């Protein structure tokens, strides 16, 4: 890739990964972000020049400008590049260009679990094939990075459905974890439009194999809608109707055990990640690896080394009011994700009381899923509800934190982190496990709690 490329919004995890990948593939790379952070420091350590002011950036010196969704069309650097006729590509459009440098690409998409599933497959392939690479939306714990370029053989990518940008991509393999109602403004609040976009994605000429979870209603709807016979379509799940069925799921000493029935063979696996949903995610990756020709024994040995992705069920031990307490930090922010996480906590800690500290994320999500929140938020033994993290949205009347728990009783409303800690100091002991959850800044609460 012999190009000079400027990355705008390079302090974000997605664009920073593309900048690193481009550099490792031979491009001359520079980046801009208004605020320096850990990611920009990492890029500078790799020899990438970072600008924090538009002043001094000679846009005319670049062949391509790549920008994140956080960069407005009116941004001076983007406007200048367009006026000069320089090729300007949104993040996913550039990822599509980058993919052409690789022989084979596998895209993971879905409303929930795509980052975790991408990290599982990335960890497997990096052990099974030293020339495999990945670009995903979270820090893969196995590599302590969201990006690794080991060669140009196989590439694992996370394909984002939230803004429909996955339609820019042309992979050979697609894994769909689920299809659910979220980011519906992208799809004009139409479920049929959402399904049509997924159909368009898997119908691309490049796509040869499709794996989808038949336990999910959205995936079943896609199967019913999709009728092309020129692709290899494989369903997986706990359902007896799955092409590859999962069974014998259980936990021993905090290790998840399960079996799958693959082409007439019964194959057993162990996984460090908790919950039925992670078994579903892992199964998709296992099947993809088996179909690529990797040996069962090698996949099984690689799978037990999978540790997932940062902020997905991260485990800590904290001392709270003199008690050693297990604390879990998790990114889940949708009712389905909340329910799955609480179920996983129950499976792993069946004899402990669950205290759920939840920070809702976006007023629009509160509003759009207002009927689904009460059931999900009733599943823990004790709910501590924080104010909604706005993500720069304006407050919507009837969609604040207290509105999503209407009809529930026994929950505690905290007006901030200090208030939540006050409740935790009263409630937590060795017989409790604390799930701290949300996509905003609630992860900081984990750090604030006493070591």
UniProtKB/Swiss-Prot annotation:
Main location: cytoplasm
Record lineage: Bacteria, Pseudomonadati, Pseudomonadota, Gammaproteobacteria, Thiotrichales
Single annotated GO MF: UDP-N-acetylmuramate-L-alanine ligase activity
Summary of the function given for this chain in its UniProt record: Cell wall formation.
Keywords, comma-separated and alphabetical: ATP-binding, Cell cycle, Cell division, Cell shape, Cell wall biogenesis/degradation, Cytoplasm, Ligase, Nucleotide-binding, Peptidoglycan synthesis
EC class of the enzyme, as a word: ligase
Residues bound to ATP: 110-116
SUPFAM superfamilies: MurCD N-terminal domain, MurD-like peptide ligases, catalytic domain, MurD-like peptide ligases, peptide-binding domain
Protein name, UniProt field: UDP-N-acetylmuramate--L-alanine ligase
GO-annotated cellular components: cytoplasm
Pathway(s) the chain acts in: Cell wall biogenesis; peptidoglycan biosynthesis
